[in-house]
Regions:
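Short, structured coil/loop segments at alpha-helix boundaries
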Residues: 51, 65, 81-85, 125-133, ...
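Short, charged surface segments at domain edges that flank catalytic/cofactor-binding sites
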Residues: 1-32
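Short leucine-rich amphipathic alpha-helical surface patches
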Residues: 68-69, 100, 123, 127
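Generic structural signal of hydrophobic/aromatic residues within well-ordered alpha-helices
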Residues: 2, 21-28, 84-85, 116-119, ...
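Polybasic, low-complexity binding patches
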Residues: 54-55, 71-115
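C-terminal, well-folded lobe of enzymatic/effector domains
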Residues: 105-146
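Histidine-centered nuclease catalytic patch
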Residues: 23-63, 69-77
Length: 146
């Protein structure tokens, strides 16, 4: 899809799904996990980890104390996590608004929703319908507005 939409054939999958964000934090801060900082985990603020613009974006990556994981994890449920996440996302949005606005402009300029639908349509008859439908749902979710 990225080759079709963006003309980019150089996107590679992170083998651990977190090695690149860890290296990015280390490069930007000079701090190494389990050497300079302990009991923290590298997390994606808004998720969208299958979207290359979000996966490596410094404004979507943070170090979170492991103690806070019950409040920040995507599987967290309940009133306390909901309240914490509301405050956390509001603060993150206020810090990174210019970058998020750039992203919003980009997905509008590229008309990502229609690009995804056209790409999936181009594969109809060559791929299993069930697989295409799941891919379309996942891609639309990954490329949606924040």
């Amino acid at each position: 899809m990225h080759a079709t939409v963006f003309g980019n054939t150089q996107i590679q999958k992170d083998p651990t799904n977190n090695a690149i964000p860890h290296k990015l934090i280390e490069r930007l801060t000079g701090l190494k996990r389990n050497q300079d900082i302990y009991n923290y985990q590298v997390s994606h603020i808004w998720g969208h980890t299958k979207n290359p613009f979000f996966f490596e974006a410094p404004w979507n990556i943070c170090c979170t104390p492991k103690l806070m994981d019950p409040f920040t994890g995507h599987e967290s449920k309940g009133i306390c996590p909901e309240e914490y996440q509301k405050i956390f996302f509001a603060k993150a949005y206020s810090l990174y608004a210019p970058f998020l606005e750039d992203y919003e402009s980009m997905i509008q300029d590229y008309d990502m929703e229609n690009q995804i639908k056209r790409y999936v349509q181009s594969l109809r008859g060559r791929k299993e319908e069930r697989v295409l439908n799941q891919f379309e749902r996942d891609a639309l979710s990954e490329w949606k507005s924040i």
